[in-house]
């Protein structure tokens, strides 16, 4: 929020003025401040022999599909985790093709689902995978019908973790 940004600016500015630092030292000071004060999420927290199902949800255009592909790549290429992709984003032009391209590159199976029953079947199909990543269509929190559709879709399995993806420039009042 803006108050956090103000605190960072005050702290780093005061430190730089008191120490008469150069711009490079100021950058390092900012990096040190952020490192000490930011909480870094450890990701999806995938544990051995425990399956994880994660759905990325959020408004249109925030990068859910790209984020999903990056998570999949990191899990598969760096950690050797067995994974599968599911897309329920059949609304955006080329969304399915984009995810199919990622699945081809990573050698991952992919299913395209149009409703809750198909999602349930796809999750069952991938039951041996350690990680199942679900891409969803962009939804506005102000559109009750869209929110209800998303809720019904993800209700097929109580183990689906919902991860909200929003733009870094989203205003605090819009995120509520």
Indicate residue ranges for each PLM-predicted region.
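A short, aliphatic-rich alpha-helical micro-motif
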Residues: 48, 126-127
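Conserved catalytic-core segment of NTP-binding enzymes
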Residues: 84, 96-98, 105, 114-125, ...
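Primarily NTPase-proximal linker/entry elements flanking Walker-type ATP/GTP-binding cores
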Residues: 2-62, 66-83, 87-90, 101-102, ...
């Amino acid at each position: 929020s803006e108050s956090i940004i103000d605190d960072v600016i005050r702290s780093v500015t005061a430190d730089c003025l008191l120490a008469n630092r150069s711009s490079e030292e100021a950058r390092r000071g900012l990096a040190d401040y952020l490192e000490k004060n930011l909480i870094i999420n450890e990701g999806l927290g995938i544990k051995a022999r425990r399956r994880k199902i994660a759905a990325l949800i959020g408004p249109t255009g925030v990068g859910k599909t790209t984020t999903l592909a990056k998570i999949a790549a990191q899990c598969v290429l760096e950690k050797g985790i067995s994974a599968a992709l599911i897309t329920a984003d059949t609304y955006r032009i080329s969304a399915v093709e984009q995810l199919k391209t990622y699945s081809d590159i990573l050698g991952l199976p992919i299913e395209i689902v149009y409703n809750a029953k198909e999602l349930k079947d796809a999750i069952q199909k991938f039951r041996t995978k350690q990680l199942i990543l679900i891409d969803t269509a962009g939804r506005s929190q102000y559109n009750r019908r869209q929110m209800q559709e998303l809720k019904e879709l993800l209700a097929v399995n109580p183990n689906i973790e919902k991860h909200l993806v929003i733009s870094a420039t989203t205003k605090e009042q819009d995120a509520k």
